[in-house]
Amino acid sequence: MSLPHDRSRLLVDDGFPSEIFSHSIDRWIETMLADDVSEEGGSNNLVRAKLIAKEKGVICGQFVINRLLDKHAPNCSYDWKISEGELVKEKEQILQISGISSEILKIERVMLNLLGRLSGISTTTSEWVSDSNDIQLACTRKTEWGILDKWAVHIGGGLTHRLFRSDALMLKENDFASAIESGENQNDAIKKLISEINLEKNSKFTVIEVQNIDEAILAAQTWSEKQRENSTSDSVVLLLDNMGPMNARIVVTELEKLDLRKWCILEGSGGIKKDIISEWSSSGVDLISTSAMNRGVKPLDISLIIEGEK
């Protein structure tokens, strides 16, 4: 089944960062440099600097570092020794920079922070993917660096999910609670909000969060009825929130009995742990989503060594 959760195509345009991605890169770079206030250091000597991996991992962040160097170290040249998404070994050189010492030292810490953290996310994601038993993995909008986190998950082999709030429609528990009027209950709100969805705009990627088996069946029924009325046949993403693999299996079985499974992409989410991925793989869902691939992960340990004058 083709999943709408891979939005990475929106981040690249003809081999370069898209406008969306470029703006995000610039905002993070400028913020980090503004926070890293420092006196001028180094000299005008021409030096060669090497970025060396102190442990193995998956490299991510070339678009970001290229932008940092091009804009804030314009007199420097650079040469990547490791490609984006490539596995680097311990003590292996990642990048070589040649130029004025003061320019390199001014951005050194920000550069290492960016490359280290993004590579840490891509490395962690790749570890999750290797243990996934072929079930697809997506991150969530619980990010620390927004779109940069999403890119790193993509480089590690995961799915980006929604890049930002307006990237796709998502109806959550609080949306339903806010829509309940006098005399109505949660189920009434679910039916009402799904019935009001603009299919012309949102049919290809809509996510509906459900808390239990009954809500999942109700959401699937309401969606299928709306699709038939509109003479369309797109699937809705049912996000099974904190339901666990056992209840997810029941949802799959019940939807199949009611001939509703074909209308749904089932996403397991909430409390996902790497040591129970195998249980999710056999649950019948189409993917699982977790913030564990990008939040609180260990950055890849990278150092910068200046060799001295050329």
Residue ranges of each PLM-predicted region?
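Short glycine/proline-centered loop/turn elements that form peptide/ligand docking sites
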Residues: 274
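Short secondary-structure boundary segments
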Residues: 242, 270, 292
